[in-house]
Amino acid sequence: MNYVPELKKYYKDSVIKELVKEFEYKSIMQVPKLEKIVISVGVGEAVRNKKLLDSAVLELAQITGQKAVKTKAKKAIAGFKIRQGQEIGAKVTLRGNAMYEFLYKLIHLALPRVKDFRGINGDAFDGNGNYSFGITEQIIFSEIDYDKIERISGLNITIVTTASNDKESKALLLKFGMPFSN
């Protein structure tokens, strides 16, 4: 039998039924679900130090279990000494089982390790049911060895759902156990 992540099982067994009751959907196909999770890191100093970008790519791969892709500058910014097409960051897009595994790890293992953690901002939805937030230190993930990192950097995490509005999306993430502060 194929492996199914715990969070995916929980979604199919409990969350769908609860959301159908709460929002009175006529079909379970209307119930919002996770589409993908995008984890990105911007390395502005990569302009001067290429080692930092390689380090960020490696750390993203360790955190997610999937190879990271380097991202390039869309346009030149003279103030930051960035040219168009220059590699300045990295990202990973998770789908399927890897997405559910990462979300479980984020909610239950990584976020509780943040100092003075009181929940994440519950207002950072984009109006289309997607949620984005930042983490200031990558060392909250247990896969990162504190002694081997080049420098402490932050991560941007975007959770893309099929929800049509923010209310449905927030309800979905709350059912998964996302620790919102408001």
Swiss-Prot record:
Residues annotated as transmembrane: none
PROSITE patterns the UniProt entry points to: RIBOSOMAL_L5
Example of a GO MF term: tRNA binding
GO cellular component, one term: ribonucleoprotein complex
Keyword field contains DNA damage: no
Sorted UniProt keywords: Ribonucleoprotein, Ribosomal protein, RNA-binding, rRNA-binding, tRNA-binding
One Pfam assignment: Ribosomal_L5_C
Species assigned in the record: Borreliella burgdorferi (strain ATCC 35210 / DSM 4680 / CIP 102532 / B31) (Borrelia burgdorferi)
Biological role: This is one of the proteins that bind and probably mediate the attachment of the 5S RNA into the large ribosomal subunit, where it forms part of the central protuberance. In the 70S ribosome it contacts protein S13 of the 30S subunit (bridge B1b), connecting the 2 subunits; this bridge is implicated in subunit movement. Contacts the P site tRNA; the 5S rRNA and some of its associated proteins might help stabilize positioning of ribosome-bound tRNAs.
Lineage of producing organism: Bacteria, Pseudomonadati, Spirochaetota, Spirochaetia, Spirochaetales
Underlying gene: rplE
Subunit structure and binding partners: Part of the 50S ribosomal subunit; part of the 5S rRNA/L5/L18/L25 subcomplex. Contacts the 5S rRNA and the P site tRNA. Forms a bridge to the 30S subunit in the 70S ribosome.
GO biological process, one term: translation
Superkingdom: Bacteria
Assigned protein family: Belongs to the universal ribosomal protein uL5 family.
Name of protein: Large ribosomal subunit protein uL5
